[in-house]
Design a protein with these regions (language model features):
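Acidic (Asp/Glu-rich) sequence patches and key acidic residues
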Residues: 1-134
């Protein structure tokens, strides 16, 4: 079970998906080669041996980077497992380097650096469903 975040290009003034036109089509993140180079530069510890599916491991968490095989890369899905708020640091570093905003698929809206409520809510839900923390 993972907390899923989508990195997507949105206009700077958009702070909530409710501000977006229904038919809005985001710009791609860029050519696949450039996106992979950005990931490698921002997250040097990421394993990109499978360039469509990278993995970044932290002390108490992991992030799977679903980059896909398309060229150009339209968006990137991050699948986060584990615990610890420090996982948000590489998420927002990568989002910034790619010129993206971070969409919390569980909450259905954008999150900002320091916005941990979605992550904490996911961990509570996960622990309740899996019986952990009892």
């Amino acid at each position: 079970m993972s907390w899923d975040l989508l990195l997507v290009r949105l206009p700077a003034e958009v702070t909530s998906v409710s501000q977006m036109a229904h038919d809005y089509q985001p710009a791609p993140l860029g050519p696949r080669h450039d996106v992979l180079a950005t990931v490698a530069g921002v997250l040097p510890g990421a394993d990109l041996s499978d360039p469509a599916w990278g993995v970044l491991s932290g002390p108490t968490w992991s992030v799977e980077l679903s980059i896909g095989a398309a060229d150009p890369v339209d968006s990137m899905m991050l699948h986060i497992r584990g615990a610890g708020d420090e996982v948000l640091t590489p998420v927002f570093e990568l989002a910034g380097a790619l010129g993206c905003k971070v969409f919390d698929c569980s909450a259905g809206d954008l999150i900002t650096p320091g916005g941990t409520s979605g992550w904490h809510g996911f961990q509570r839900f996960r622990d309740r469903v899996t019986g952990e923390g009892r």
